[in-house]
UniProtKB/Swiss-Prot annotation:
Topology Lumenal: residue spans: 26-329
GO terms under cellular component: Golgi membrane
Superkingdom, taxonomy of origin: Eukaryota
The entry's keywords: Glycoprotein, Glycosyltransferase, Golgi apparatus, Membrane, Signal-anchor, Transferase, Transmembrane, Transmembrane helix
Carbohydrate-modified residues: 129, 181, 295, 308
A Pfam entry, by short name: Glyco_transf_29
Keyword Chaperone appears in the UniProt entry: no
Protein name, entry field: Type 2 lactosamine alpha-2,3-sialyltransferase
Family affiliation: Belongs to the glycosyltransferase 29 family.
Gene name linked to the record: St3gal6
Residues spanning the signal sequence: none
Location in or out of the cell: Golgi apparatus membrane
Alphabetized InterPro entries for the sequence: Glyco_trans_29, Glycosyltransferase_29, GT29-like_sf, Sialyl_trans
């Protein structure tokens, strides 16, 4: 009888182990954990991030890969929605663009830092005269966005860039800003963005129709440096971080997250610790600088009908107050 009970006990332990592996040994897309770690080139970080509960799929791979983006979309649900936050009806556009890229890798194969400290550097004027450059450069991963320059602002924002999120309308075209160590991540909002990427990589004449301003007519980054962000990240920024409605009233223009909020959401998926810099806006001073570069003022941002800066500031204040992230500015 005693041996029988021991056998039952051992069987229970084994069954628990199997169920544990099934439930926790895969990420939100049902990729085996070892496969995902290999794909990410990141070792396991056993420290649970402070922001982990914000994410539905904590181990989501942030970039699309041609070999499996259809399968991944079916798992995450982005196959049920058209652009800007899904791939429905535009699968061939994505496939065509992804086929022109040389890689969908996240980190360099030699990068084996298990728990990554990341800083997301916004473009806010609050960075002016802060001399945070050396501090920013000390992080494992540095995420920037759009055409926020490093050149000429090294003392304020540092010199290194790991990832730079961009749109066709906001990417650098001046080769003086080129950095061979940067991975440039396209955030897709419309089919024209994918068409633009194909045309620019093939050296074709750029069709500029359908953009809110003239897109870049040349790309300073090499083919191996380009990635396409999974629309799920943008969807998550809009619906889970900012709590935007999926359908806006007919008398309201739909609101979309800024590149900064999208960058923070991406950081939550690849980092164990996230710090922020340059995300504070002075709404009460319309003449205060909008960016740490250039002459634009806050009055310009207040005219933007496509973003909800109040919702974004509430979100940022909340995650800072709850110590999910650390704010450097």
């Amino acid at each position: 009888m005693k041996g029988y009970l021991v056998a039952i006990f051992l069987s229970s332990i084994f069954l628990y182990y199997v169920l544990y592996c099934i439930l926790w040994g895969t990420n939100g897309y049902w990729f085996p954990a070892e496969e995902m770690r290999t794909r990410n080139n990141v070792n396991n970080c056993f420290k649970k991030p402070a922001f982990a509960n914000l994410l539905r799929f904590p181990q989501l791979y942030p970039f699309l890969c041609r070999a499996d983006f259809i399968k991944v979309a079916a798992m995450s649900g982005t196959n049920n929605f058209p652009l800007p936050y899904g791939i429905k009806t535009f699968e061939t556009y994505f496939s065509s663009a992804l086929s022109k890229l040389q890689s969908c890798d996240l980190f360099d194969e030699f990068d084996r830092v298990p728990c990554k400290r990341c800083v997301v550097v916004g473009n806010g004027g609050v960075l002016k005269n802060k001399t945070l450059g050396a501090t920013i450069d000390s992080y494992d991963v540095i995420i920037r966005m759009n055409n926020g320059p490093v050149l000429g602002h090294e003392e304020e924002v540092g010199t290194r860039t790991t990832f730079r999120l961009f749109y066709p309308e906001s990417v650098f075209s001046d080769s003086s800003h080129y950095d061979p160590n940067t991975t440039a991540v396209l955030v897709v909002f419309k089919p024209q963005d994918l068409r633009w990427l194909v045309e620019i990589l093939l050296g074709k004449k750029i069709n500029t129709q359908g953009f809110w301003k003239t897109p870049a007519l040349k790309l300073i980054y090499k083919q191996y440096q380009i990635r396409i962000l999974d629309p799920y990240i943008t969807s998550e920024a809009a619906f889970q971080m900012l709590r935007f409605p999926r359908v806006f009233p007919k008398d309201q223009k739909p609101k979309h997250p800024t590149t900064g909020i999208i960058a923070i959401t991406m950081a939550f998926h690849i980092c164990s610790e996230v710090h922020l810099a340059g995300f504070k806006y002075n709404f009460y001073s319309p003449n205060s600088p909008l960016h740490y570069y250039g002459n634009a003022t806050m009055s310009l941002m207040k005219q933007n009908a496509y973003h909800n800066l109040t919702a974004e500031q509430l979100f940022l204040n909340d995650i800072i107050k709850k110590k999910m992230v650390i704010n450097l500015t």
